[in-house]
From Swiss-Prot:
Allosterically activated by fructose-1,6-bisphosphate (F16BP) and inhibited by AMP. InterPro entries: ADP-Glc_PPase, ADP_Glu_pyroP_CS, GlgC_bac, GlmU/GlgC-like_hexapep, NTP_transferase_dom, Nucleotide-diphossugar_trans, Trimer_LpxA-like_sf. Belongs to the bacterial/plant glucose-1-phosphate adenylyltransferase family. SUPFAM superfamilies: Nucleotide-diphospho-sugar transferases, Trimeric LpxA-like enzymes. AMP binds at residues 40, 46, 52, 130, 370, 386. Alpha-D-glucose 1-phosphate binds at residues 114, 179, 194-195, 212. The gene is glgC. This is Glucose-1-phosphate adenylyltransferase. PANTHER family: GLUCOSE-1-PHOSPHATE ADENYLYLTRANSFERASE, GLUCOSE-1-PHOSPHATE ADENYLYLTRANSFERASE-RELATED. Homotetramer.
Length: 431
């Protein structure tokens, strides 16, 4: 393990990102989000009033100084590709800055798509080698968080690791959804199990397990060697968590990086924020938290901006209708192009170009772009998919049986509404 002085840290914080390439795994379907991902990959799902989920990983890269990125796509990639082309095309290739789109190459005989997360990188190795990077940062494109990857790169170099895995404690009852590790006093990973049925607890905190976040830093040459070896293994599932990380752990070359060391927060005393918004309830809850008085995730931090594609839209408008009812909102996010006419919106998130007509009451709802709400509607504890036309007088979120019959209702009572569901009920979706 190498001990570095403060000046060395500052120098490495500038140099290491320039020697790195980030590969963002963005091909996931996100089946737990149900119909919300029928026509788009999970990283392309809208979030926070104006963003897409993948914007967080991409913004973290830029803010960390990494300006060479590859986005590995697969499932329903059109929306994702379109978003990146529109919103992330400002790089200067002459300065060796880029976002490369890497679709499934379908090079394997008898295989049409990526066989696992590691195979997604393997199939693009010929392209990735051309980047001539010293370090490769592997990221999931479907998580919400702010992280300075330069700090993780410094930790990787300082510990003399060949592979570094970002980790954080999670409640032991939730740990079965993650790779779980045990570490020694130097953060060397001494045991790693992917999604165990009975997760081991942390020695100093029996109620929690130390979970992998699916964020990795590799020495580039070591990663390429591992991937080629894994590709030849017929018994491998070609997955980082299931195959590569346990193998590296067994070789004694994997180290853990505690997420709090690189998590970017405005309040240093706040809990580190990282969310896998993979279920409808988690997605709904994370969106609504942004509308709270003091949200857990600070989206207003000028030092760590989250970038996205910005349409040229007029400001949101709140108007009084002809009956004298005022358009009002409280504890909500309302994006550009929205019009709220004579209705009340409380603790909700409205994406761009949403129109709410008179006499409506919207409470704890997430309305994706271009939703049109007819007069006298009541929407509560729901997610309304893009461009839905909610007919006049419709009530959602007040009758569990009725909601489950017409739409998708989660066990927690969150209702998902899509255009297809509304069409099946006989409601036209064209205006």
């Amino acid at each position: 393990m190498v001990s570095l002085e403060k000046n060395d840290h500052l120098m490495l914080a500038r140099q290491l990102p320039l020697k790195s390439v980030a590969l963002i795994l963005a091909g996931g379907r996100g089946t737990r989000l149900k119909d919300l991902t029928n026509k788009r990959a999970k990283p392309a799902v809208h979030f926070g009033g104006k963003f897409r989920i993948i914007d967080f990983a991409l913004s973290n890269c830029i803010n960390s100084g990494i300006r060479r990125m590859g986005v590995i796509t697969q499932y329903q990639s059109h929306t994702l590709v379109q978003h990146i082309q529109r919103g992330w095309s400002f790089f200067n290739e002459e300065m060796n800055e880029f976002v490369d789109l890497l679709p499934a190459q379908q090079r394997m005989k008898g295989e049409n798509w990526y066989r696992g997360t590691a195979d997604a990188v393997t199939q693009n190795l010929d392209i990735i080698r051309r980047y001539k990077a010293e370090y490769v940062v592997i990221l999931a494109g479907d998580h919400i968080y702010k992280q300075d990857y330069s700090r993780m790169l410094i930790d990787h170099v300082e510990k003399g690791a060949r592979c570094t895995v970002a980790c954080m404690p999670v409640p032991i009852e939730e740990a079965s959804a993650f790779g779980v590790m045990a570490v020694d006093e130097n953060d060397k990973i001494i045991e790693f199990v992917e999604k165990p049925a009975n997760p081991p607890s942390m020695p100093n905190d029996p109620g929690k397990s130390l979970a992998s976040m699916g964020i990795y830093v590799f020495d580039a040459d070591y990663l390429y060697e591992l991937l080629e070896e894994d590709d030849r293994d017929e018994n491998s599932s070609h997955d980082f968590g299931k195959d590569l990380i346990p193998k590296i752990t067994e070789a004694g070359l994997a180290y853990a990086h505690p997420f709090p060391l690189s998590c970017v927060q405005s309040d240093p005393d706040a809990e580190p924020y990282w969310r896998d918004v993979g279920t409808l309830e988690a997605y709904w809850k994370a969106n609504l938290d942004l509308a709270s008085v003091v949200p857990e995730l600070d989206m207003y931090d000028r030092n760590w901006p989250i970038r996205t594609y910005n349409e040229s839209l007029p400001p949101a408008k709140f108007v009084q209708d002809r009956s004298g009812s005022h358009g009002m909102t409280l504890n909500s996010l309302v994006s550009g192009g929205c019009v709220i006419s004579g209705s009340v919106v409380v603790q909700s998130v409205l994406f761009s170009r949403v129109r709410v007509n008179s006499f409506c009451n919207i409470d704890s709802a997430v309305l994706l772009p271009e939703v049109w709400v007819g007069r006298s509607c009541r929407l509560r504890r729901c997610v309304i998919d893009r461009a839905c036309v909610i007919p006049e007088g419709m009530v959602i979120g007040e009758n569990a049986e009725e909601d489950a019959r017409r739409f998708y209702r989660s066990e927690e009572g969150i209702v998902l509404v899509t255009r297809e569901m509304l069409r099946k009920l006989g409601h036209k979706q064209e205006r």
